[in-house]
Amino acid sequence: MNYWRRTLGARESTVEAFEGYLKRFEQPTQEGFVVCLRDTAAIVGGVNINNIARGSLQSGTLGYTAYASTTGRGYMTEGLWLVIRHAFVELGLHRLEANIQPDNITSLNLVTRLGFQREGYSAAFQFINGEWRDHERWAITAEMADIAAQPTNQDQPR
């Protein structure tokens, strides 16, 4: 999960405004989701699965962003869990990875709550806002999430 240190702006507060965001996921290696409130359909954030690899890997990398005004209410916990479930059940993935800056306590708490395990540290991992940033690498598998995906024959290595 590459958590971008940016909050969503008012211009991105409708589904229509997210069309550009969603269009970039119209390829087999990426999927994008908008996290909305159930009652009002107000957008509270977005989640994406990038670098989807098939064959013997069956994996992807998560990214997300949220409105600062909606943090601490469990919306991203629920939204991210739904995307994780979708990745394991609907997409048949086996593993999801999250890369998080070490000082991003909110994001670290989120993945810990969802059952991710810390796997390592990547120095100068991603170029953000003019600087190379270190990241911690976290991951979860379908078994760890107790959502076992059943691969189809077409998903198996040849």
Give residue spans per PLM region:
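Acyl-donor (CoA/ACP) binding surface of acyl/acetyltransferases
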Residues: 32-158
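Conserved GNAT-fold acetyl-CoA-binding loop/helix
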Residues: 1-20
